[in-house]
Amino acid sequence: MPPIVISWLTGFISGLLLAIPVGPVNLTIMNEGAQLGFRQAAMISTGALLMETLYCGVAFTSFASVFNHAFIKEAMDLGSFVFMLGLGLWFLKAKAVRNPTKIEERLEQKFRPTSAFMTGFVRVMGNLGVPASWLFFAVYFDSHHWVDPAPASKAACVFGVTTATGLWFFGLSYAAALGHKKFSDRTLLRMERGSGIGLLVLALAHGCQIVWQMHHSHHL
C-alpha cells in the first residue's frame, strides 16, 4: 500500500476515534440541529472542523519534528502510551456527557461568538485536549512511520483527519435535525466507550511494542 494511502487511513481512523466521544461540541451540534435544523448545526460543524484541522495541522507539520532527538523521542513514545491508555480509560469509564470546561466558557465570554460558525470554532479552540491529543498522536505516528516524513504524506494524514471528523460532525448534524435529538445519553455514552476501547487496543499494541524493543535492546 502506498505511504500516502497509509497516512490518509491513519488520519481517518484517529480522527474518527477522537471525534466520537461526547463533549461540548457534539452536544452543541445535536441541540442546535434538533431545535434549529441542519443548516445551523452544519455551520457549527464547519467552525469546529476548521479549528480541529488547524490544531491537527500544526501538530503534524511543526511540533512533531521537534521531538526527533533519540532521548526525547523515547520519552515521548512512552508518554504517548500513557496518554492513549489514560484517554481510553477516561472514555471507557464515562458515566455522563461532559459540559463545557471553564476555559471554554471563558473563551466564549471573551470572544462572544455571534454566529453558529464561530460558536463551533471557539468551542474547539477552548478544548485543550484537542491540541494535546494531536501532538501525542503526531509524535506516535511519526516514530512508528505510520505517517511518512514527506510533506505530501503529512498533508494526506491531516486530510484523513478532516474527512473523518467532517463525516462525523455533519452526519451528527443531519441525524439531529432529522430525528430531533433522538440520540439518548445512553447511546452517546456507548459510542464514547467504543472509542475508548479503540484507544485501549492501540495503547496495548504500543505497549507490547515498547516491551519488545526493550527486550531486543537488552539482548544486543
Name each region found by the language model.
Residues F38-A116, A175, G207:
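Membrane helix-loop-helix hairpins that form the core translocation module of multi-pass transporters
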Residues P2-I4, K73-L78, G86-P131, L135, ...:
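Alpha-helical multi-pass membrane helix bundles of inner-membrane/thylakoid proteins
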Residues G57-F60, G166-K182:
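Transmembrane alpha-helical segments of integral membrane proteins
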Residues F60, G126-P131, L199-Q213:
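Hydrophobic alpha-helical transmembrane segments in multi-pass integral membrane proteins
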Residues S80-F83, S195-G198, L202:
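Hydrophobic alpha-helical transmembrane segments of polytopic
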Residues T46-V58, G126-G129, V161-F169:
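Membrane-embedded alpha-helical segments of transport systems
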